[in-house]
């Protein structure tokens, strides 16, 4: 059984993921521009369509994972997905700190601009909260039916919102 402190840490990280993902989904064009900037930074051939699609997919995935953490759905799986995503975000923000390109992180889409150092510190704090929330491995709860229903509703609304934002 997860303690209240661990649940609060999981909810805090989940809410950051939800807000970050929704802000990316709200502005698919802006998110696509951010992804294109990352393509240039990483020397990947850029494509506006691929960048826009990847931006929306990233926003939907972040929001979905965030809702799963908030509602404590599949905690054994979610902890590994979040740890992997957060590790990738942290390494990418470390690269931004080291090479200091003329771009912002895009963590919260075009809505909130953070410096490279602010992004890196945010990612370190989130990584710490993840470790507090989900480790040791055997401390998880069993998901209840209402959690599945709430999570599924949240995912459906997020995907619907993403489709609406894409076309309008």
Q: Could you tell me what each predicted segment is?
A:
Residues 3-4, 8-12, 16, 29-139:
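Hydrophobic alpha-helical segments
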Residues 22-27, 167-168:
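Helix-to-loop transition at the C-terminal end of transmembrane segments
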Residues 18, 87-94, 156-165:
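Aromatic-anchored segments of alpha-helical transmembrane domains
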Residues 143-168:
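Internal/C-terminal transmembrane anchor helices
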